[in-house]
C-alpha cells in the first residue's frame, strides 16, 4: 500500500497545526517530511526510502523533551503530529490486496514492515525515555496518539501470514513487546481493556482506527485487517467485551458473510467469541441473538467440514440464549426450538452424505444435540434411527471416529428416550450385532485399541438396550454362543448376558 495514499493533502486543520509548530525548527522539519510524503513524486521507491531515512535520522537526533512538546490547552502539537506520522507509517507497511497470496509483492511488503518497525522502535524508545524523565501529560499525550497505529502494525506483521517473513515478524514482535513495556501492561489483553478497573484501555481507539477498513465495501482492500480484528477480538473477554458490542458485531457479521470459506470460518469464530463473552441480556436486546442465529445457521448449507464444525459449536452455545425467550405453560406441546430446527437439518444432510470428513463432523456433534434436547429427542427418533443404523454399517477409517460417536449418540438416545426404545429392539439389535461381527473380523489396518473401543461401546449399547426392553435382549441372544464360531464375538455376547443376569460390569 502506497504511503502517499495514506496521507491526504493537508487540510485546514493541518495548516493550523503547521502554524502552531512554526516556532519550532523540529516541528518545521517534521511538517516538511509529511508534505514530502504527500507529493506525487513520493510514489517512487527511492524517494520513500530517502524520506524514511530522514525520518529515522530526525527521531534519533531529537531530544525526547522536544519530541513531545505541545502548545495550547489540549497539548496539540508534536504529539498529534507523531500520531499522524504513526498512522501513515502503519498504512505504508500494510499489505496490499495483491499481496494476500504472496508472490512478487511478498518480500517487498515484509521489507517495508521491517523498516517501519525499526522507526516505531525508535519512537517507543523516546517515549520510554520521556516517561522516566518528565512529570506531566506530555509523554502520555504522545503515547495516546502513537499506541493505536503501533499496535495495528505489530499485530499485522507478527502473525504468520503470506506477507511476512521471519525478519519482519521478529521486528513486529519487538515492537509489540516495547509497546507493552512502555504502556506498563503485562499482556495484550491488559493493553486493550485496561490493567485495572480504573484504566479505560485502548480497544475503543483501535476499533476506531480499524472501522474505516471493516466496511463491506472496504474490508478486502487490506488482507491483514480481518486477522488483526479477529485476533484483537479474541483477546477481550467478559466483562469488557459487552461495552464494545455495537462495534465488533457488525464487523464479525460482514466477515462471515463472504463467499470464501476461509472468511466464513474466521467470521463464525468471531461470532462464537461474542456469544461466549457477551451477557445473554445484551444479545437478546434488539433481536441480536436472532440475527446471529440466522447468520450462522445459513452456513450449514455449505458442505465444508471445517466450517460446519465451527458453526455447530457456535450454535450449541447460542441455543441456551435463544431459549431464554421460550416459555412453556405445561398445558400443551412444548414449542419447537432452534435446536430442533438445526438437528432436523443436520439429519437431512447426514442421511445421504458420503464424504467421510463431513460424516465425521456431523457424527462428532450429534451427541451434544441429543444431550441438549433430552427427552424432546423423541421428535427426531425415526430419522435418528435411520442415521444411526446407516452410519454403523460403514467403515470410517482406522480411527473410526464416526462410528464411535454414533455409538455414543445411541447410548444417550436410549437413556433419554427409553420408553420408546423397546419397539425398535429388533432393528437396533441387528445393527449392533452386525457391527460386533464386522469389527471382530475386520481385515483392515484398524488398531486393536480402536477395535476394542468399538466393541466396548457396542456392548454397552446392547446392555442398555436390554434394560430398555425389560431383558428381552438376553433371550434373543441365548442361542448365539452355541452357533457362533468366532470366539471374540461370543465373549462380548456373554458379557451382555452376564450383566443382564445381574453380574457386575465395569463398562457401564
Curated annotation (Swiss-Prot):
Keyword check for Magnesium: no
Region (Disordered): 1-20
Superkingdom in the source lineage: Eukaryota
A GO cellular component annotation in the UniProt record: nucleus
Protein keywords: Disease variant, Intellectual disability
Gene Ontology biological-process entries: positive regulation of DNA damage checkpoint; protein stabilization
Record's disease association: Intellectual developmental disorder, autosomal recessive 39: A disorder characterized by significantly below average general intellectual functioning associated with impairments in adaptive behavior and manifested during the developmental period. MRT39 affected individuals show delayed psychomotor development, severe speech delay, short stature, kyphoscoliosis, and dysmorphic facial features. Behavioral abnormalities include hyperactivity, aggression, and stereotypic movements.
Protein task: Regulator of the DNA damage response (DDR). Part of the TTT complex that is required to stabilize protein levels of the phosphatidylinositol 3-kinase-related protein kinase (PIKK) family proteins. The TTT complex is involved in the cellular resistance to DNA damage stresses, like ionizing radiation (IR), ultraviolet (UV) and mitomycin C (MMC). Together with the TTT complex and HSP90 may participate in the proper folding of newly synthesized PIKKs.
Family statement: Belongs to the TTI2 family.
Subunit structure of this chain's protein: Component of the TTT complex composed of TELO2, TTI1 and TTI2. Interacts with TELO2 and TTI1. Interacts with WAC; WAC positively regulates MTOR activity by promoting the assembly of the TTT complex and the RUVBL complex composed of RUVBL1 and RUVBL2 into the TTT-RUVBL complex which leads to the dimerization of the mTORC1 complex and its subsequent activation.
Name recorded for this polypeptide: TELO2-interacting protein 2
Native organism: Homo sapiens
Amino acid at each position: 500500500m502506497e504511503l502517499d495514499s495514506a496521507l491526504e493533502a493537508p487540510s485546514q486543520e493541518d495548516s493550523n497545526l503547521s502554524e502552531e509548530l512554526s516556532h519550532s525548527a523540529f516541528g518545521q522539519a517534521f511538517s516538511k517530511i509529511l508534505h514530502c510524503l504527500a507529493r506525487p513524486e513520493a510514489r517512487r521507491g527511492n524517494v520513500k526510502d530517502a524520506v524514511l531515512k530522514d525520518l529515522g535520522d530526525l527521531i534519533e537526533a531529537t531530544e525526547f523533551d522536544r519530541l513531545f512538546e505541545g502548545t495550547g490547552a489540549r497539548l496539540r502539537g508534536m504529539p498529534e503530529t507523531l500520531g499522524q506520522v504513526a498512522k501513515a507509517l502503519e498504512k505504508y507497511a500494510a499489505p496490499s490486496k495483491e499481496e494476500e497470496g504472496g508472490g512478487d509483492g511478498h518480500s517487498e511488503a515484509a521489507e517495508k514492515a521491517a523498516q517501519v518497525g525499526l522507526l516505531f522502535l525508535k519512537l517507543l524508545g523516546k517515549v520510554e525515555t520521556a516517561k522516566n524523565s518528565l512529570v506531566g501529560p506530555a509523554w502520555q499525550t504522545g503515547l495516546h496518539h502513537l499506541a493505536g497505529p503501533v499496535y495495528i502494525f505489530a499485530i499485522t506483521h507478527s502473525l504468520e501470514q503470506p506477507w511476512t517473513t521471519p525478519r519482519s515478524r521478529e521486528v513486529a514482535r519487538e515492537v509489540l513487546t516495547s509497546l507493552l513495556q512502555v504502556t506498563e501492561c503485562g499482556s495484550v489483553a491488559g493493553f486493550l481493556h485496561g490493567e485495572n478497573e480504573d484504566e479505560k484501555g485502548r480497544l475503543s481507539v483501535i476499533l476506531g482506527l480499524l472501522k474505516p477498513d471493516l466496511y463491506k465495501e472496504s474490508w478486502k482492500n487490506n488482507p491483514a485487517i480481518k486477522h488483526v480484528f479477529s485476533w484483537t477480538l479474541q483477546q477481550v473477554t467478559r466483562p469488557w467485551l459487552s461495552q464494545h458490542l455495537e462495534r465488533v458485531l457488525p464487523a464479525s457479521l460482514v466477515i462471515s458473510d463472504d463467499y470464501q470459506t476461509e472468511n466464513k470460518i474466521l467470521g463464525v469464530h468471531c461470532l462464537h467469541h461474542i456469544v461466549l463473552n457477551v451477557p445473554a441480556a445484551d444479545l437478546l436486546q434488539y433481536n441480536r441473538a436472532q440475527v446471529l442465529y440466522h447468520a450462522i445457521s445459513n452456513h450449514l448449507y455449505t458442505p465444508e467440514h471445517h466450517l460446519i464444525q465451527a458453526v455447530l459449536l457456535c450454535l450449541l452455545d447460542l441455543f441456551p440464549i435463544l431459549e431464554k425467550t421460550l416459555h412453556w405453560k405445561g398445558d400443551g406441546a412444548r414449542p419447537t426450538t432452534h435446536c430442533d430446527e438445526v438437528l432436523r437439518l443436520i439429519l437431512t444432510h447426514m442421511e445421504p452424505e458420503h464424504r467421510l470428513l463431513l460424516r465425521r463432523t456431523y457424527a462428532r456433534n450429534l451427541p451434544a444435540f441429543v444431550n441438549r434436547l433430552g427427552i424432546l429427542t423423541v421428535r427426531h427418533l425415526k430419522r435418528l434411527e435411520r442415521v444411526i443404523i446407516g452410519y454403523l454399517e460403514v467403515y470410517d477409517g482406522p480411527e473410526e471416529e464416526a462410528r464411535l460417536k454414533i455409538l455414543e449418540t445411541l447410548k444417550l438416545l436410549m437413556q433419554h428416550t427409553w420408553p420408546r426404545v423397546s419397539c425398535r429392539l429388533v432393528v437396533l439389535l441387528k445393527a449392533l450385532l452386525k457391527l460386533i461381527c464386522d469389527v471382530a473380523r475386520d481385515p483392515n489396518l484398524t488398531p486393536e485399541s480402536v477395535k476394542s473401543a468399538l466393541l466396548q461401546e457396542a456392548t454397552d449399547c446392547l446392555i442398555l438396550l436390554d434394560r430398555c426392553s425389560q431383558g428381552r435382549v438376553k433371550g434373543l441372544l441365548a442361542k448365539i454362543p452355541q452357533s457362533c464360531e468366532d470366539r471374540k464375538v461370543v465373549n462380548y455376547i456373554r458379557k451382555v448376558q452376564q450383566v443382564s443376569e445381574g453380574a457386575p460390569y465395569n463398562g457401564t
